[in-house]
């Protein structure tokens, strides 16, 4: 079962924007050694928007091979074109992914019926577990709870990453779906509360730099130990906040360089973290106990 702390993995690059396979392997090993429950490759944090289709497949294949079945590998395969999303999802299945994460179509702003038909078509076209991903702050399109509940009965659609941070919405989804449908947070600050409501885990940016702590948080919350889970969350709150001082994944990539886990590299139109944010991120790493 897919549950717990699922890292939204960055895609390491060099100064010229070329994929850095050595650092990617190091990051996968870092998560395997520190209790991460699943890896989400080539999602938003993995800069999927600026990877070619060939690179997309190569990253999934690399991560699947490195993980070697020890934890699930989930591939980001969403697109604002239904046919492209089918193509990416089939590629991810062929590359060995355990499941796919499909973001709500961005820019073209489909209706709720359009969203239903989009995700239903992909689920019927490719036989692989699929997780919906609602993040209206990035897509400018908000999938309502009623649409999620409707999609929850479609074969191959197994869950949703709900990244709004709206706990009332999360509860409405949880109340309307079967117990087998996985509701996950995509918002680090509120993830603990969503899990305590009945969610199954968190697809996390913070887990890139604090995998052990995020795994402990999710495990405590899944066990119903609210006091322990909230205490860990409070310690991680500086990271939850300051890893978004600029657009994700800019700050978290800077943090990983500071930790010695990868080299400096990002693709335009994203740029490296501005100097005014450097100390914010370093301070958050120290306050959360990641750096001393």
UniProtKB/Swiss-Prot annotation:
Binding site for pyruvate: 45, 203
GO molecular-function terms, A-Z: 4-hydroxy-tetrahydrodipicolinate synthase activity
Record-annotated active site: 133 (proton donor/acceptor), 161 (schiff-base intermediate with substrate)
GO biological process: diaminopimelate biosynthetic process; lysine biosynthetic process via diaminopimelate
Entry EC number(s): 4.3.3.7
Cellular location(s): Cytoplasm
CDD domains membership: DHDPS
Pfam families, per database record: DHDPS
Keyword field: Amino-acid biosynthesis, Cytoplasm, Diaminopimelate biosynthesis, Lyase, Lysine biosynthesis, Schiff base
Main location (coarse class): cytoplasm
Entry's Gene Ontology cellular component terms: cytosol
SMART domains per the UniProt record, alphabetical: DHDPS (SM01130)
Complexes and interactors: Homodimer.
Name the UniProt record assigns to this protein: 4-hydroxy-tetrahydrodipicolinate synthase
């Amino acid at each position: 079962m897919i549950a717990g702390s699922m890292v939204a993995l960055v895609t390491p690059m060099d100064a010229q924007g070329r994929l850095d396979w050595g650092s990617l392997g190091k990051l996968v090993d870092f998560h395997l050694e520190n209790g991460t429950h699943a890896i989400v490759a080539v999602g938003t944090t993995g800069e999927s928007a600026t990877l070619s289709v060939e690179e997309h497949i190569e990253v999934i294949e690399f991560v699947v091979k490195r993980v070697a079945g020890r934890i699930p590998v989930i591939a980001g395969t969403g697109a604002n074109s239904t046919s492209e999303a089918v193509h990416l999802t089939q590629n991810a299945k062929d590359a060995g992914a355990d499941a796919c994460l499909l973001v709500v179509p961005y820019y073209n702003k489909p209706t709720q019926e359009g969203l239903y038909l989009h995700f239903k078509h992909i689920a019927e076209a490719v036989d692989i577990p699929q997780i919906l991903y609602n993040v209206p702050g990035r897509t400018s399109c908000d999938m309502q709870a009623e649409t999620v509940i409707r999609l929850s009965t479609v074969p191959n659609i197994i869950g949703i990453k709900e990244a709004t941070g709206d706990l009332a919405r999360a509860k409405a989804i949880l109340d309307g779906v079967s117990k087998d449908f996985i509701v996950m947070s995509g918002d680090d600050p509120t993830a603990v509360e969503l899990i305590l409501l009945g969610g199954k885990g968190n697809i996390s940016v913070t887990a890139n730099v604090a995998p052990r702590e995020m795994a402990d948080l999710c495990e405590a919350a899944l066990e119903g130990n609210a006091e322990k889970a909230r205490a860990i969350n409070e310690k991680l709150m500086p990271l939850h906040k300051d890893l978004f001082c600029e657009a994700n994944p800019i700050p978290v990539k800077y943090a990983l360089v500071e930790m010695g886990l990868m080299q400096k590299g990002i693709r335009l139109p994203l740029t490296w973290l501005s100097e005014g944010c450097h100390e914010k991120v370093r301070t958050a790493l120290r306050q959360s106990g990641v750096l001393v």
